[in-house]
UniProtKB/Swiss-Prot annotation:
Recorded GO MF terms: ATP binding; RNA binding; tyrosine-tRNA ligase activity
HAMAP family: Tyr_tRNA_synth_type1 (MF_02006)
Protein name from the UniProt record: Tyrosine--tRNA ligase
Enzyme Commission no: 6.1.1.1
UniProt motif 'HIGH' region: location: 40-49
Motif ('KMSKS' region): 226-230
Keywords attached to this entry: Aminoacyl-tRNA synthetase, ATP-binding, Cytoplasm, Ligase, Nucleotide-binding, Protein biosynthesis, RNA-binding
Catalysed reaction, written as an equation: tRNA(Tyr) + L-tyrosine + ATP = L-tyrosyl-tRNA(Tyr) + AMP + diphosphate + H(+)
């Protein structure tokens, strides 16, 4: 049974702007296609893309046919919208490699999605045809009035990037005409590009068309910071770049306030289910009901049940200290997720702590040991003169070092 897609988006706090609400609902009733564009700027999507991926899936669950447009052509240029400077241009080989990787990721997350590549229809348009058939419909003052372009004019905007909005407008026109696609969704920075597409359709096909668009709020943390970055950089959807364990921990480490917002924006839990979680969490905050639900839902969504099971096993092993039961596969995941270094088996604990960068100096290492802040294989260590070879090794080659409550390191004993 279909629910009103706009009501669903509204209670979750997702909508930034809508061009025409009635057209969106008409498109839902007609089971039209909806599309979202992804430019292949890297060989993996990251958590910053999840807002749009999940919104595309929400539309799919409410009767729309989901289309992921991969920008094989526009990705060669780069979207200037609200960017501080021009992107470094990628080679065609880089773009093709990224397209293959991203398409595979998206297909795993949204199995019903259809893929289109705008290179298929943009690559063969000659410069003369572009100027006559597309450029003719865009007034210069109209483009300069777009906030996404106006913000870059002062710092410098190349003709290449200036043409981007026209290419994206043509994408919407092409899908509207050939794929029964009447709705485009995008991030809050895409309003100018989406409305350009609708205006182009109005100008070239029919003023009384059914094209419409929705922009989605930028996901920010409660302190105003941009969401999705950590001290070590982006959190990727590719498990070879960000392991399932790291991915799970990223969500688990969100604040209570951010967790509530993320459960609404990024999961498919109902309003009642989220309210029940909040109630449980308020009664027993130490059990982290909100964070556990968020981390589980997100890890399962991106890495399926198998990926979630791996993350939970590793999390439980770290918490309980039962590291000897870990499979080699899981310990390799831990190794990729945690700071690690090779250390000689005859090295003293105090020297190993400095080598592993657990402590910045021997003096600091002694302080940690004195305060019982160092655990090796889950045993509190106080003797700085113990040598690495005196410990039982996990799988005959590893030691797990823990500093305080949350910081883990791995020693590869040689």
């Amino acid at each position: 049974m279909k629910n009103n897609i706009l009501e669903e988006l509204k209670w979750r706090g997702l909508i930034k702007q809508v061009t025409n609400e009635q057209k969106i609902l008409d498109a839902q009733n007609s089971n039209d296609a909806v599309y979202c564009g992804f430019d292949p700027t890297a060989d993996s999507l990251h958590v910053g893309h999840l807002m749009m991926i999940i919104t595309l899936k929400r539309f799919a669950l409410q009767g729309f046919k989901p289309i992921a447009l991969i920008g094989g052509a526009t990705g060669m240029i780069g979207d200037p919208s609200f960017k501080a400077s021009e992107r470094v241009l990628q080679t065609k080989q880089q773009v093709d490699h990224n397209i293959n990787k991203i398409s595979t990721q998206l297909k795993e997350i949204i199995p019903t999605v259809s893929f289109v590549n705008n290179r298929d229809w943009l690559e063969d348009i000659s410069l003369i045809d572009f100027l006559r058939d597309i450029g003719k419909h865009f007034n210069l003052s109209y483009l300069l009035a777009k906030e996404s372009i106006a913000t870059r004019i002062q710092t410098g905007l190349s003709v290449t990037e200036f043409c981007y909005t026209m290419l994206q407008a043509f994408d919407f026109y092409y899908l509207y005409k050939n794929n029964d696609c009447s709705v485009q969704i995008g991030g809050s920075d895409q309003w100018g590009n989406i409305t350009s597409g609708i205006d182009f359709i109005s100008d070239t096909i029919n003023k009384n068309n059914k094209a419409s668009g929705v922009t989605i709020n930028l996901l920010t943390k409660s302190d105003g910071q941009k969401f999705g970055k950590t001290e070590s950089g982006a959190v990727w959807l590719d498990k070879t770049k960000t392991s399932e364990y790291e991915f799970y921990q990223f969500w688990f480490n969100q604040t209570d306030e951010d967790s509530i917002n993320l459960l609404k924006c990024l999961t498919f839990l109902t309003k009642d289910q989220i309210e029940q979680l909040i109630k449980q969490h308020n009664q027993q905050p130490a059990k982290h009901f909100l964070q556990k639900a968020l981390a589980s839902e997100m890890t399962k969504f991106v890495h399926q049940q198998q990926g979630l099971d791996k993350a939970l096993k590793l999390t439980e092993a770290f918490f309980s200290g039962d590291l000897f039961s870990l499979t080699d596969d899981l310990f390799k995941m831990a190794l990729n997720s945690l700071p690690n270094t090779q250390i000689n088996k005859d090295t003293k604990v105090i020297d190993a702590l400095v080598e592993l960068k657990v402590a910045s100096s021997k003096r600091e290492a002694r302080e940690f040991l004195k305060n019982k802040a160092i655990l090796i294989n889950n045993q509190v260590i106080e003797d700085e003169n113990l040598v690495i070879s005196s410990f039982d090794l996990i799988q005959n080659k590893y030691l797990l070092v823990k500093k305080g409550k949350k910081k883990y390191f791995v020693i590869l004993v040689k």
